[in-house]
């Protein structure tokens, strides 16, 4: 019998007997465990051989045998829990222990670095699962980061300085204003073993042609081996950066036929997905990666939803602290939480409503009414970027007849709930009821349901001149809520003729967007980890991090 099953049987027997020595029979014990008399004898003999109990059998009708426990069920449960932790069986651990606070403490004690069978393993604690990792779909901040570890694209944007680097394409050039040529590396392999072919690249880039930022791609072909031509309907100085973004990651052309591809995707990146469940995401270093092999062999993201109730619920790498090993990496996000007024509803489009609501729900009001732990993580926002001060809050008078407003945000985000509660209380002081809708991220991203205002957040990556417009333009919700010629804006941006600061100031001037809070991103880690540089998404590049060996 497998060790885990035997441990479960012992714990159950110990609980049924209250851990006390007693005189009993095989039949009585078999009834307790719902098994046959013969199987019960086998269980007792095996448990006795393990040193967990003694079974003094008496032969004869009416005679009772003595059962003595040498090991407590609690001790064995703890041992079983440790075994499950080492095996990364978090779902079974939660079932075994039951108490989520106890599970949390056990997980934290095993965070950080682990060295098993010659492999470096990093364990991370996160507050929600990541079910969808499919490029070109609605991905949140963390899914975007993980996708970058799994997939490759024609180009790559350096997370630290925003500079463009080679990836699948080793060189590229602009042949004419409407034609770019990329030269691809041969011999690249997908995680499932097949070699990447030009058809995979063409299929991957063709499938995203419906997205706004890629809609100007008119034709993709290969004039010669490992050479890719991309034809455009309008010039685009940002095209090489655009092809380094997650939607343009390269998938095997048969991806739609592969089981559970969104949660278990296959790419050509430095890490391959081994497991993705509600309790754990495990990715392994890909030995056949065409770039430098990752130095951390395995990354385990353990999911414990209850940690989202804490204000600093981002990324935890902190294991047992030894000799002042704890380190905290932090940065103020390049982006903010903001309110988005929906021009499709009468209240959302009303200038006086926008003016008054933005006054009542000002950054300083939100910060003042927040709990102290959140006040340490929040910074008032007066522009989409921390360095900008575009917002001009006015006094505003409450519009006559305003009695209710609808606010919508996406699930699994504790700070959205906190901000919404503060907003509800502030508006209630003025006899306005805030109706709150909490929806799935896909629904929020599409923005097709009715709401007066939406609670959003944006994290812009480097280079900001590229990502600020690209991020806002690629979210259908914003295009639905803000009536303007987005295609004309995109043409100006592609041509390098857009003044982004002025463009953002226009959005803030009519209160279409109202910045609320900049957030401090935090990674709680260990000083033994090298190469950990937090990116603008609040994560770090796994393949570039490594562990310093202990002092001899």
Curated annotation (Swiss-Prot):
Keyword Transcription regulation carried by entry: yes
Gene Ontology terms for molecular function: DNA binding; peptide transmembrane transporter activity
Assigned keywords, A-Z: Activator, DNA-binding, Repressor, Transcription, Transcription regulation
Region of interest (Solute-binding), residue spans: 163-493
Superkingdom of the organism of origin: Bacteria
Family annotation (HAMAP family): HTH_type_SgrR (MF_01449)
Protein name: HTH-type transcriptional regulator SgrR
């Amino acid at each position: 019998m497998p060790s885990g099953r035997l441990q479960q049987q012992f714990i159950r027997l110990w609980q049924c007997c209250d851990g006390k020595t007693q005189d009993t029979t095989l039949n009585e014990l078999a009834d307790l465990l719902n098994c046959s008399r013969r199987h019960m004898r086998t269980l007792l003999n095996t448990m006795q051989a393990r040193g967990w109990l003694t079974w003094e059998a008496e032969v004869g009708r009416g005679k009772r045998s003595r059962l003595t426990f040498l090991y407590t069920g609690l001790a064995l449960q703890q041992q079983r829990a440790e075994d499950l932790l080492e095996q990364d069986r978090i779902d079974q651990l939660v079932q075994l222990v039951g108490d989520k606070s106890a599970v949390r403490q056990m997980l934290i004690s095993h965070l950080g670095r682990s060295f098993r069978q010659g492999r470096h393993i990093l364990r991370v604690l996160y507050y929600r699962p990541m079910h969808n990792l499919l490029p070109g779909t609605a991905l949140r901040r963390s899914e975007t980061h993980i996708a970058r570890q799994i997939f490759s694209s024609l180009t790559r944007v350096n997370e630290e300085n925003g500079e463009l680097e080679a990836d699948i394409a080793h060189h590229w050039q602009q042949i004419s204003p409407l034609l770019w040529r990329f030269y691809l590396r041969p011999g690249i392999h997908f995680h499932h073993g097949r070699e990447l072919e030009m058809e995979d690249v063409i299929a991957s880039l063709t499938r995203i042609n419906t997205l706004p930022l890629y809609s100007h791609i008119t034709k993709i072909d290969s004039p010669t081996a490992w050479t890719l031509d991309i034809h455009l309907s309008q010039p685009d100085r940002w095209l090489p950066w655009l092809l380094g973004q997650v939607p343009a990651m390269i998938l095997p052309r048969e991806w739609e036929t592969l089981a559970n591809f969104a949660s278990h995707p296959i790419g050509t990146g430095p890490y391959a997905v081994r497991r993705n469940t509600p309790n754990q995401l495990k990715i392994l270093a890909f030995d056949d990666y065409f770039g430098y092999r990752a130095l951390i062999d395995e990354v385990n993201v353990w999911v414990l939803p209850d940690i989202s109730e804490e204000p600093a619920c981002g990324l935890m790498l902190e294991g047992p602290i030894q000799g002042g090993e704890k380190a905290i990496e932090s940065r103020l996000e390049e982006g903010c939480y903001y309110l988005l007024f929906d021009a499709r509803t009468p209240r959302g489009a009303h200038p006086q409503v926008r003016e008054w609501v933005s006054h009542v729900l000002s950054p300083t009001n939100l910060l003042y009414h927040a709990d102290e732990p959140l006040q340490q993580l929040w910074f008032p926002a007066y522009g989409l970027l921390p360095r900008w001060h575009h917002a001009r809050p006015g006094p505003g008078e409450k519009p006559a007849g305003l009695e209710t407003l609808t606010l919508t945000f996406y699930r699994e985000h504790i700070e959205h709930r906190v901000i919404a509660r503060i907003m509800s209380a502030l508006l209630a002081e003025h006899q306005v009821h805030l109706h709150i809708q909490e929806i799935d991220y896909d629904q929020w991203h599409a923005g097709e349901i009715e709401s007066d205002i939406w609670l959003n957040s944006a994290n812009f990556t480097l280079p900001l001149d590229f990502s600020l417009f690209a991020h806002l333009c690629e979210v259908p919700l914003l295009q639905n809520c803000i009536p303007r010629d987005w295609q004309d804006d995109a043409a100006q941006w592609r041509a390098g003729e857009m003044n982004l600061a002025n463009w953002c100031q226009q959005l803030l001037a009519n209160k279409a967007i109202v910045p609320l809070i900049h957030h401090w991103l935090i990674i709680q880690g260990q000083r033994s980890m090298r190469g950990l540089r937090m990116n603008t998404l609040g994560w770090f590049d796994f393949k570039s991090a490594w562990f310093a060996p202990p002092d001899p």
